[in-house]
């Protein structure tokens, strides 16, 4: 059986990530070459030996001294090796990568942290991270939604709804002329778009739900929450006013741990019955659950 669309997306992204970033732990430093070998020194050489060897090789391969193109390429490698080994921090990281080549991700992170960490603006890094995460989040949401829609469209209930809507639109008359198959297919697509598909757990993707957008709107959200809470305290704690229908519904829904969309799908009579029970009060809620347990046992 083929994996679901969402899993295939995730697998493809993981493989792409691995293909881009996973490589030899030491290759990120001097490529396929050994940094010490490029400078002609041993791994335990001191800083003076490394510096002396670099200047000696510079006299032979520097572009100003040697115009040969191959020598120019070699000098670039030598200069790179010297930049890595002259600094105690990067040299220690390189030595660790040699000793622990299996720790690919750690060694790679250490390298780029040392190379770019001090040059990067934390704000730019944060923005970039939010953009990347939001992009992945949106792609995942779209994949999940399309997969859920495709699943629903294969159910008998959906097909019956579509057939009923088609009969209503055409008056029960089918087109048997040439090309009717294409016309019927187009009509089905139009009717399918008219059907309101409410799929729990796979709502239509919205930019307002993205992590980056929520982060940008965080100050507004906090202010809005503080205003709402202050109004609640003033109205119901200080003035002791009776709960409005909306607020009583909110308290009831929160007491029963019912999601907003599930509450919206309840009929008005059921909502009114639950609100009148004042389930936000502990004793009333306990009595309600006790009644539900008794009712469940009775039905068995």
Swiss-Prot record:
Residues 34-98 form the J domain. Expressed in leaves, flower buds and flowers. The chain crosses the membrane at residues 123-143, 207-227. Glycans are attached at residues 46, 88. Residues 144-206 are cytoplasmic. It is a multi-pass membrane protein. This is Chaperone protein dnaJ 50. It comes from Arabidopsis thaliana (Mouse-ear cress).
């Amino acid at each position: 059986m083929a994996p679901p669309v969402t899993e295939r997306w995730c697998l493809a992204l993981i493989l792409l990530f691995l293909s881009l970033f996973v490589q030899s732990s030491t290759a990120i430093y001097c490529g396929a070459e050994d940094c010490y070998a490029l400078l002609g020194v041993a791994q335990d050489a001191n800083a003076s030996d490394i510096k002396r060897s670099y200047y000696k090789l510079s006299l032979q391969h520097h572009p100003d001294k040697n115009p040969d193109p191959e020598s120019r390429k070699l000098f670039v490698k030598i200069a790179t090796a010297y930049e890595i080994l002259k600094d105690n921090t990067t040299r220690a990281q390189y030595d660790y990568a040699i000793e622990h080549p299996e720790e690919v991700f750690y060694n790679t992170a250490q390298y780029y942290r040392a190379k770019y960490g001090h040059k990067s603006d934390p704000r730019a890094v944060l923005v970039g991270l939010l953009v990347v995460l939001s992009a992945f989040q949106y792609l995942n949401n779209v994949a999940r939604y399309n997969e859920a829609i495709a699943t629903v469209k294969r159910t008998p209930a959906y097909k019956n709804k579509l057939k009923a809507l088609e009969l209503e639109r055409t008056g029960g008359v089918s087109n048997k002329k040439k090309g009717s198959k294409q016309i019927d297919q187009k009509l089905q697509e139009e009717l399918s778009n008219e059907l309101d598909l409410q799929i729990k757990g796979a709502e239509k993707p919205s930019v307002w739900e993205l992590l980056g957008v929520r982060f940008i709107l965080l100050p507004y959200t906090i202010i809005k929450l503080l205003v709402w809470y202050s109004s609640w305290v003033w109205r119901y704690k200080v003035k002791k006013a009776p709960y409005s229908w909306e607020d009583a519904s909110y308290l009831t829904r929160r007491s029963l741990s019912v999601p907003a969309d599930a509450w919206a799908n309840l009929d008005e009579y059921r909502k009114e019955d639950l609100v009148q029970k004042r389930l936000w009060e502990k004793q009333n809620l306990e009595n309600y659950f006790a009644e539900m347990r008794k009712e469940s046992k009775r039905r068995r």
